[in-house]
Amino acid sequence: METKWFDLRTAEDAERIAQAADILRRGGLLAIPTETVYGLGANGLDENAVLHIFEAKGRPQDNPLILHIPDASWLTRYCEDVPEAAYKLAERFWPGPLTMILKKKPCVPLRTTGGLETVGMRCPDHAVTRAIIEKAGVPVAAPSANTSGRPSCTTAEHVREDMWGKIDGIVDGGPCQVGVESTIIDLTVTPPQLLRPGGLPLESLIDALGEVTVDKAVTQKMNDGEKPRAPGMKYRHYAPKAPVTVVTGGAKASARYLLTHAGENAGIICFDEFVPLFEGHIVHPLGASDDKRAQAQHVFDALRTFDETDVGEIWAQCPDSKGLGLAIGNRLKKAAGFHTEASDDGKTVVGITGCTGAGKTSLLHALEREGACILDCDKIYHEMLESDESLRKALRAAFGGTIFRADGTVDVHALGLIVFQDAEKLASLDAIVCAHVPRECARRMAESNAKLIGLDAIKLIECGLGAICDVTIAVTAPEEVRVRRIMARDGITEEYARARIAAQQAAEYFRAQCGCEFVNDLPTAAEAAAAAEDFIHMIIKNLKEETER
């Protein structure tokens, strides 16, 4: 079959719109853009055209289709007993990502509705598609324009991958702005019931209607033999080729969980701020943990991207269920066949960093007195040099065998001579360390019985470890104070102490990167200890209050 391509990204073209509409009138299949995902459209009143949708997608025929219309005035053409609530929702949210389940009229074939006496109605928020429907003069039945079992399409190129040569035309209307399918609400029951979370948050429906219940299929698999009342309820859509595990819980806790559970050949879907932690993996960022609109736009692209790789498994962070998070989580969990793992461990992680000589020890001791498990990343790195074969292999590949002694141990001095005279090699060492140490830190956090963890790392920010801390503290002190401390601590000259300070990031860097600052310029150890204890008490109190809010 020849597939026609209609480029309507930049302007409405009356001639091309008419040509696209003619495909629908003649009973053909046309991929259309919407604000949510691309749809595979056909005349919803033509049983043969609808059958071709199921054939092109490989879609089960008991999976209902949604009718797309240009405005609410078309509702009474295809629906019986339209309730006032439907017009109320249409006025407030149409055009937009909302589908309403209503009683169908006899003119709507049972093939379109999956054998149900109800039909889903939607007005898409895409001017080109509404113009095509208006010109065609028929309601357009349109599930997502992907092969069944594949992630939904959010660009016309995605549609081309799945449907070229199988359908009559593809309308390129640009990338979808929402990225997840429409929200579906059943208005034939009292109170109204959410059947599928989508681009319109549940909270918006509750605000408009009052009470809205949530069907159990939103959060768990339907039982065998149950008939789906709306698209996306029963069947495992959005499934990439590799098995998916979705990790629920707080963003930081779930990132720590991924670090300790994802295998070497795992693909990672994570929030933007955690990407540096997964060096060496194929990573698809979902969006920042606090930006659910971006997450919705990226979720299907993330799932689809991994099909072009050889990853053996996919691990995905899951947003909370507020706002669009309910829909994003629903799509991820469906991709995983509802295979989820919970990450919340009740642990609080305090990251401490700062310049040499700033006095981090005072804060670390204060944390210890609160029962914290202290993880010294530098110490962990040196322990890994002795025992971690993956790290040793990476070092050998980067720096050769000359950094190893005859007994096979790493000669740290020899390694230092190489990297401290060559900025590129130092950067290479930093990258290797950052690819290995965070995973070991996360493993030790998970193994510890302590609920409070102190993470001591000079490279806390660069390695991405700061992102998995509940709070990050920059410890600073005036340069003259640091010089005196380093000289006394290490027995070195003032010149050497100043050279060490000059080789590190300035205090301003740590101050800008961390959530708070502890200025340790006190003259005695006792005064520093008392101030550190007060500071840690304040930090723990603030974290507790944030958790309770």
Task: List where the protein language model places each region.
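Active-site-adjacent structural elements in enzyme catalytic cores
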Residues: 1-344
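ATP-dependent small-molecule kinase phosphotransfer cores
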Residues: 379-452
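NTP-dependent small-molecule kinase module
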Residues: 18, 443-452, 466-475, 479-492, ...
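P-loop (Walker A) phosphate-binding loop of NTP-binding proteins
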Residues: 355, 367
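ATP-binding Walker
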Residues: 358
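Walker A/P-loop
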Residues: 361
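Hydrophobic anchor at the beta1->P-loop junction of P-loop NTPases
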Residues: 352
